[in-house]
Amino acid sequence: NLIIHKAVTVDEALDVWGHSKIGLNIMTWHKYGMTERIADICLSGAVCLTDASEYLRNNFNNNENIIMYDLSRLDELPGIINNVLSDDSFRKHTADAAYLLAKEKHTWKIRTMEFLRMIKGENNK
């Protein structure tokens, strides 16, 4: 079932994504980066369905740990959603891979450690 929620807080969104198979994201102002929403969707156990950004193309694998769509081809979105929802194995594999990647690279703890290394002038290893 498609559920379109009214506006929710960040905490409420985490609960919604935790009960969802897919979290739909639109990269409004972050065309070269990533938003917290993407990490939150991945960490919730849902498949993240988002338009692409340079950062996402370089740090995620489309159809492996994220599903990216093209805003100029929105007519393809219903088919993409149907494919994800009709193949439980693919959906679960994608969500699990996204969770592992987000847990390894996209938590606030990881980001804090990266910032501290930058401040100290260390490389990002």
Which ranges hold each PLM region?
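Catalytic binding pocket for nucleotide-activated donors in carbohydrate/polymer assembly enzymes
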Residues: 1-123
